[in-house]
Each structure stands twice: as structure tokens, then as C-alpha cells.
Amino acid sequence: MVQEKSKIPDAKRIVSSSHLVSEKAAELSEVEYGLIVAWNAFGKWMVKAMATAVAEADISVSGGTDLNVLDILCFHSVNHRARPKKLADICFKLNVDDSHTVNYALKKLIKANLVSSEKHGKEVLYATTDVGIDLCLRYRAVREACLVDGFMPFDGGSGAELGEVARQLRLLSGLYD
């Protein structure tokens, strides 16, 4: 069976590493570059949004140190559904294999009084403090003010098109895991 060559010339492709472009799946290189750019943009946005929420709340985070992307992801994961979480559950949800990095983020969040920990037998459960809940609400307000209006142009506001993109990204993640 002969593989049909893509109709887009390689010179027109937007990729991060031309030496990785495959004749069988050149589009995959384009998707990978899109993921790289989107991930970094999303990370920068999360850090800036959290810094804005922290400034509005007038709290000190970890002695003045800004929260990084993993700290913020862990923070929102702990707050999710207002139920205490185990380290393993947070790692699983975020698809992070290096649990020590998540553990470090949780310690940083505890030091900032955004998250608390409580030992139950051999397990440690993490929960959001009242200060943390307030900060999550402030972050949500920043997110609403900055992103929701920009979201509407994707498909007229129904969200179906972006929902399909999210589904495709979850499927793609299975290829890399």
C-alpha cells in the first residue's frame, strides 16, 4: 500500500523540529508544536492570573514567592469538589509520575496557608483552607473576566467545537503515555 504524501509542503509546516517531521504523519509534528506553544501560553496565563488573584486577596504566598504552574495545578486539584485528596490521587489526576514534585508543591501550598494536611492512618489527606477557597474564587473571577468573552468566537458560544478539541487532546495523550 502506497502512503499518500501530505498536500502541505514541508516548508509550509509550522513545527518545532523539522528533523522530526515524518512523511507518514507530518501533521503530528504540527500538533506537537501546537501543544508546546499552547502549554507554555497556558502556563504563563495561569501564573499571571494567580498573581492577580493573590494581589487582590492581599495575601503572602510562601514568603512572597510566586506560585508556579505545578503549584497552581495542585492547588486547583486539591480544591476540586471540596473533598480532601491523597497525594496519589492528585498525581493521577494531573498525570504526574514524579510524586515528589507534587509533594513539594503541596508543602509550598501548606506553608502559604492555602492547603492543609491531615493524617488518616498511613494516608495524608490534603484540603483547601478558607484562605485557599477564597483565592480559588478570586482566580475564577480573573479567569471569567479574561477568558470567557474570548472563548465565544470559537464556535459562536456553544462550546461544542472546543469540547471536541478537548476530547481529541485526551485521546492524543494516550499515544504519549
Report residues per predicted region.
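Amphipathic, non-membrane alpha-helical segments in soluble helical-bundle scaffolds
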Residues: A25-I36, S99, T129, G159-L162
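Generic structural signal for well-ordered, non-transmembrane alpha-helical segments
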Residues: I36, N40, D130-L137, G163, ...
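Basic, amphipathic "hinge/linker" alpha-helix immediately C-terminal to the N-terminal HTH DNA-binding motif
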Residues: G121-A141
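Canonical helix-turn-helix DNA-binding module
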Residues: A82-V124
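N-terminal leader segment of winged-helix/HTH proteins
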Residues: M1-V61
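Solvent-exposed, charged/polar functional surfaces in cytosolic regulatory/catalytic domains
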Residues: A41, W45-T52, R138, V142, ...
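Terminal interaction helix/tail motif
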Residues: A141-D177
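N-terminal helix-turn-helix DNA-binding core of bacterial DNA-binding proteins
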Residues: V47-D97
